[in-house]
UniProtKB/Swiss-Prot annotation:
This is Glucosamine-6-phosphate deaminase 2. The keyword Protein biosynthesis does not apply. GO terms for biological process: carbohydrate metabolic process; N-acetylglucosamine metabolic process; UDP-N-acetylglucosamine biosynthetic process. NCBIfam families: nagB (TIGR00502). The gene is Gnpda2. Its EC number is 3.5.99.6. It comes from Mus musculus. The modification Phosphothreonine is found at T161. Its main location: cytoplasm. Keywords: Carbohydrate metabolism, Coiled coil, Cytoplasm, Hydrolase, Isomerase, Phosphoprotein. HAMAP family: GlcN6P_deamin.
Length: 276
């Protein structure tokens, strides 16, 4: 497991975006070889998406041969609702890049048969050859996607009832009105993400510090679902200084001492431009 510690949110976002960019370019995607990328929503990845859009607009990165799979979607919220994750992804990322809409996979929370929708999503991932890099974020309680505390660590894509802490946290997106906040969602399972060849989790802010401590310094525990990634062969946690506040000093010092190695993963930044 790698822990990459940057000074602040902006630098953490940039590091993550550079890593995604380099992974896609090194993969050399093409018409018969698509790169499969798992993606999160929420406030944490916005900075990363902004940088990826910059790399695309500068001609350094193309998503023409990339397939994306989003982590989750609310149940019962229309796709065109401003707070649906479909709207989030198109407004904040997809409409600014050259991805084929048919290759941007987002769960349908209004499907007539929700279980069939979940099963079909898992099948699409298999048909794509699995996910090369799954990018995620976590909540203050350590949940990844909508795998709330107590979720099975081998779970697959399914329908989940949201924890009250999650509903309260999401109320800010619905004018503070709890009655408007969806109480159920479709989500990839912990096992779905664990199947990815590589996982990168973005963790920023002091309010995520205890979750990072649980993920890094304590054992695997289904009450802290992010801890499952201790058992993944290729996990990277990308965080800012604030997120490390609950870690032991020697833990932080150890991983900061490896930054010269970690930075080689993003420097130089590769480009798809001719001659680069």
């Amino acid at each position: 497991m790698r822990l990459v510690i940057l000074d602040n949110y902006d630098l953490a976002s940039e590091w993550a975006a550079k890593y995604i960019c380099n992974r896609i370019i090194k993969f050399k995607p093409g018409q018969d070889r698509y790169f499969s990328l798992g993606l999160p929503t929420g406030s944490t990845p916005l900075g990363c998406y902004k940088k990826l859009i910059e790399y695309h607009k500068s001609g350094n990165l193309s998503f023409k041969y990339v397939k994306t799979f989003n982590m989750d979607e609310y149940v019962g919220l229309p796709r065109n609702h401003p707070e649906s994750y479909h709207s989030y992804m198109w407004n904040n990322f997809f409409k600014h890049i050259d991805i084929d809409p048919n290759n941007a996979h987002i769960l349908d929370g209004n499907a007539a048969d929700l279980q069939a929708e979940c099963d079909a999503f898992e099948e699409k991932i298999k048909e794509a050859g699995g996910i090369d890099l799954f990018v995620g974020g976590i909540g203050p309680d350590g949940h990844i996607a909508f795998n709330e505390p107590g979720s099975s660590l081998v779970s697959r894509t399914r329908l989940k009832t949201l924890a009250m802490d999650t509903i309260l946290a999401n109320a800010k997106y619905f004018d503070g009105d709890l009655s408007k906040v969806p109480t159920m969602a479709l989500t990839v399972g912990v096992g779905t993400v664990m199947d990815a060849r590589e996982v990168m989790i973005l963790i920023t802010g002091a309010h995520k510090a205890f979750a990072l401590y649980k993920a890094m310094e304590e054992g695997v525990n289904h009450m802290w679902t992010v801890s499952a990634f201790q058992q993944h062969p290729r996990t990277i946690f990308v965080c800012d200084e604030d997120a490390t506040l609950e870690l032991r000093v020697k833990t932080v010092k150890y991983f900061k001492g490896l930054m010269h190695v970690h930075n080689k993963l993003v420097d130089p930044l590769y480009s798809m431009k001719e001659g680069n």
